[in-house]
Curated annotation (Swiss-Prot):
Residues noted as binding 4-imidazolone-5-propanoate in the record, renumbered to the chain: 83, 146, 179, 245, 322
Function field: Catalyzes the hydrolytic cleavage of the carbon-nitrogen bond in imidazolone-5-propanoate to yield N-formimidoyl-L-glutamate. It is the third step in the universal histidine degradation pathway.
Molecular functions per Gene Ontology: imidazolonepropionase activity; iron ion binding; zinc ion binding
Protein name as catalogued: Imidazolonepropionase
Transmembrane segments annotated in the record for this chain: none
Major subcellular site: cytoplasm
Co-factor: note: Binds 1 zinc or iron ion per subunit.
Cell location: Cytoplasm
Positions bound to Fe(3+): 74, 76, 242, 317
Listed pathway(s): Amino-acid degradation; L-histidine degradation into L-glutamate; N-formimidoyl-L-glutamate from L-histidine: step 3/3
Reactions the enzyme catalyzes: 4-imidazolone-5-propanoate + H2O = N-formimidoyl-L-glutamate
NCBIfam families: hutI (TIGR01224)
Length: 403
């Protein structure tokens, strides 16, 4: 098939590159590839021999690998304080459940977050965000969930949005009011869910793009989470769910019934849960950092996900208690080493499938015409190197919206 080589006014053009477009079912590799963009959108991605001529700026990539900009689709980046002391307790034998029931865990971060101003939350989050940006991340999801009051949850979401005005990154704010029970509602979780559903969700609807909940024995019941998801959808918000991290409550199947973008963690998900997610199109977001940091032993059912065709994404789960990491590249290696993902599965997990987990498949996640020109240019030629290496950042350049 021949292609007409029209002259197009292009703002930017990257040539002499090996492209991993992520289009199709694999890495979408194109040798001697070209990416061209205008007004922040990709207008050509393919072989150099078929590329239209241009009068715009041309950047010779000298054989480097270009992937879509990476996407961290599950983080708790905004928070006050840290929980290094609880980590020390865990090293001495305390369980996550014991720490939480003793007033630690999420509630201890709640206190520090409530005490912090919006400006302080932004300032403390910036180093964590910058570490992810330095690894080629161009889109990040940031959850609330450490305020646990209407005003403090709003403060967290405003802080998350503020980051996008300070750095060149797309931020997807998620409301996670049903993260833990605040002390003032101790013993009356239904009343707190009443607050989440009746007051918080209407208040945050203009700031958040999605709503999440923590479906666990130390969190909220499936019935309570169902109320949260239903209220979110009634306000036009996308939904997702923390599910099956510590126990099998079939939260992932619940998420699927509500048309959730994703269910996340999933170490205790059953075959039926995974099948329900596949049928609903919900993405399985795996979080190897939390698995590693908590010394978990039960693996998420990756083979069942493959068998049923459930899409798999990877994320840092950046948070102060169970995954204090700001390295998505490390998650690539952990996803492969701990969970048995292939190179293709891992890389698609931080690009095309991560975009699906945020409901942004039409915008980002692949290098295709019409999508945002979010790229990561790497000082490697083989995509496997991004998954293989540990403590090594080969990022050459990060491109956000063509710049």
């Amino acid at each position: 098939m021949t292609h007409r080589r029209d002259t197009v006014q292009m703002e930017q053009r990257w040539t002499n590159a090996r492209l991993a477009t992520m289009a199709g079912d694999d890495l979408g590799l194109i040798d001697d590839g070209v990416v061209a963009a205008k007004d922040g959108r990709i207008i050509y991605a393919g072989p150099a021999k078929d590329a239209p001529a241009t009068q715009g700026a041309v950047h010779d990539c000298e054989g480097r690998l270009i992937t879509p900009g990476l996407i961290d689709c599950h983080t708790h980046l905004i928070h006050g304080g840290n929980r290094a002391n609880e980590w020390a307790m865990r090293l001495e034998g305390a369980s996550y459940d014991e720490i939480a029931r003793a007033g630690g865990g999420i509630v201890s971060t709640m206190r520090a977050t409530r005490d912090a101003s919006e400006a302080e939350l932004v300032a403390s989050a910036l180093p964590r965000l910058d570490a992810l940006i330095a690894e080629g991340v161009t889109t990040i999801e940031i959850k609330s969930g450490y305020g646990l009051s209407t005003n403090d949850e709003l403060k967290m979401l405003r802080a998350a949005r503020a980051l996008a005005n300070i750095r060149a990154i797309r931020v997807e704010p998620t409301f996670l009011g049903a993260h833990a029970l605040p002390p003032e509602y101790q013993g009356d979780s239904d009343a707190y869910i009443d607050l989440v559903v009746g007051e918080m969700i209407p208040a945050v609807a203009s700031l958040a793009t999605a709503v999440d909940a923590f479906c666990e024995g130390i969190g909220f019941s499936p019935e309570q989470c169902a109320r949260v998801l239903a209220a979110a959808k009634a306000h036009g918000l996308k939904v997702k769910l923390h599910a099956e991290q510590l126990s099998a409550l079939h939260g992932s199947a619940l998420a699927a019934r509500h048309g959730a973008l994703s269910a996340d963690h999933l170490e205790h998900a059953t075959d039926e849960d995974v099948r329900a997610m596949a049928e609903a199109g919900s993405v399985a977001v795996l979080l190897p950092g939390a698995y590693y940091f908590m010394r978990e032993t039960r693996l998420p059912p990756v083979q069942a996900m493959r068998r049923h065709g459930t899409r798999i994404a990877l994320a840092t789960d950046n948070n102060p208690g169970t995954s204090p990491t700001s390295s998505l590249l490390l998650m690539l290696n952990m996803g492969a080493t701990l969970f048995g993902l292939t190179v293709i599965e891992a890389l698609r997990g931080v690009t095309v499938n991560a975009a699906a987990a945020l409901g942004l498949s039409a915008e980002i996640g692949t290098i295709e015409v019409g999508k945002a020109c979010d790229l990561a240019i790497w000082d490697v030629g083989d995509p496997a190197e991004l998954v293989y290496r540990i403590g090594f950042n080969p990022l050459h350049q990060r491109i956000k919206d063509g710049q």
